[in-house]
């Protein structure tokens, strides 16, 4: 009898232990998973907040970036209007050479604009180039994207298109622009973009005629220096919390260019490119080189192939340097999660402005990167850019 009682008690005790262990095991599993989940949220964000909204612009004009960021923060579906606002703000504030006193006229003294915008969701592109008589070229480029089946309109036809949609006629060439052009003419039209012509393009203004092919020369290509305020193109990239991307660019073109020249701002993949499934990129530098290599497109495709933003940016710049040893310029790359990086060459350092991003450190903060060495440059110590200070009127606001 005593033995049966002991066995019964032992059985009950074993059942209780099994039940307790089961409860403890489930509780441990629950809290362990909860802890891992909390850690995942802390490191990477929830599924909803994994994407880091941000607004990036090239060079160090903080006010235009901040205006674009404020538009992006107004709600969903604002990436398009954000990049447009950034371009318009820079146009009105005369960022760099954009419409500043002594802007970038062509070799006939005329000031024309080019601009482009790209939708990363539909991969649609709208651009204008060589357009005279309209201040905010980005609005006309946006109209090309939204109201036509084309991607690029140029010259007087682009101006006529703008008029047909009600955009105000406003010719931008003024007395200051003419003075800059006259000074260039009095200096023998130096520098210019001609080659293998006669009379010599290094001493004369033309008109020119072609040299016979056996007299063609191949001088070392030496880039012009890019310094603070002496660039004529700015680009903006906007990414929202839903992963939607828009990129835009606006430019007054290379100074004293041959009339009719189209620059990188208007060419898909040269100055800007975006794909919501991968990310986006903006580039700045010698537009003719950028058009030959399409660095913004290459950067996005490099990320599609598995490279991280920093790897993609450096790979693109190294590729440019392999073919153009004196290249001056930069590329900024952003993946679809909002992780960004930049690389440059031919400058002491490259500046770009960021609002948002990881932890929202501050708004319109100027980020600086040291540039890659041009190890294979043919012209030793070729011209490089200098960016010693941020203009006082564009002091960095703190968020």
Curated annotation (Swiss-Prot):
One term under GO cellular component: lysosome
InterPro entries with a match to the protein in the record: Ntn_hydrolases_N, Peptidase_T2
Family annotation (Pfam families): Asparaginase_2
The GO terms this record gives for MF are:
N4-(beta-N-acetylglucosaminyl)-L-asparaginase activity
Which keywords describe this protein according to UniProt? Answer: Disulfide bond, Signal
Indicate the secretion signal residues.
1-22
PANTHER family with a match to the protein in the record: L-ASPARAGINASE (PTHR10188), N(4)-(BETA-N-ACETYLGLUCOSAMINYL)-L-ASPARAGINASE (PTHR10188:SF6)
Family membership: Belongs to the Ntn-hydrolase family.
What protein name does the entry list?
A: L-asparaginase-like protein GG20738
